[in-house]
């Protein structure tokens, strides 16, 4: 199983992002992310044995309680930069609370043998990937003509454990477990999907 943890996006945010991508998709031949797949990754875990899934869920269930917080989604940009970009992204602004959630999850998973990230936590939504050089002038002009890059907010009171599976129509993300913030995990702050 290929796993990661993340924060889901509400439908109203999906709708705003879809309106943006409907304008931009025709302007450049990129590998565009399906809006329904967009999420805020807090920790990429990688391959994990299915028979040990309950062990991981138990560890995440024991995270210390954290207060719910708000994430703002706004702005767009390029990784690593506007020259020869590889990723087109939307900005995720969760402040210290989101960074703390990510580091708390990471710390909890280290005893399971999950390596720490070597790069600084940089939350974003991957809107498109660029595998080879393509003309971007029309896309840049379309971006310049847009008036707003405010995609709304996410009232974050939970995160999920996801499985990532390749499919014929692209990658499919499935929620395996849900973990609520603001409650101690021992009081039932998580549940296994389908349990």
Model-derived segments and spans:
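Histidine-dependent nucleotide/RNA phosphoesterase domain, centered on the 2H-phosphoesterase fold
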Residues: 1-195
């Amino acid at each position: 199983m290929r796993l990661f943890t993340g924060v889901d996006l509400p439908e109203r945010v999906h709708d705003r992002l879809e309106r943006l991508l409907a304008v931009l998709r025709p302007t450049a031949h990129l590998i565009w992310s399906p809006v329904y797949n967009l999420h805020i990754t807090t920790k990429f875990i990688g391959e994990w044995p299915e028979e040990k899934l309950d062990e991981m869920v138990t560890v995440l269930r024991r995270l210390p309680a954290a207060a719910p917080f708000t994430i703002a989604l706004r702005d767009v940009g390029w990784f690593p930069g506007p020259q020869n970009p590889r990723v087109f992204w939307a900005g995720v602004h969760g402040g210290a609370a989101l960074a703390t959630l990510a580091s708390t999850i990471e710390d909890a998973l280290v005893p399971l043998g999950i390596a720490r990230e070597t790069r600084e936590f940089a939350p974003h939504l991957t809107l498109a990937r660029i595998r080879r050089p393509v003309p971007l002038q029309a896309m840049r002009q379309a971006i310049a003509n847009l008036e707003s890059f405010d995609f709304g907010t996410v009232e974050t009171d939970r995160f999920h454990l996801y499985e990532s599976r390749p499919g014929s129509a692209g990658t499919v993300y499935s929620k395996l477990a849900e973990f609520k913030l603001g409650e101690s995990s021992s009081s039932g702050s998580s549940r296994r999907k389908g349990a």
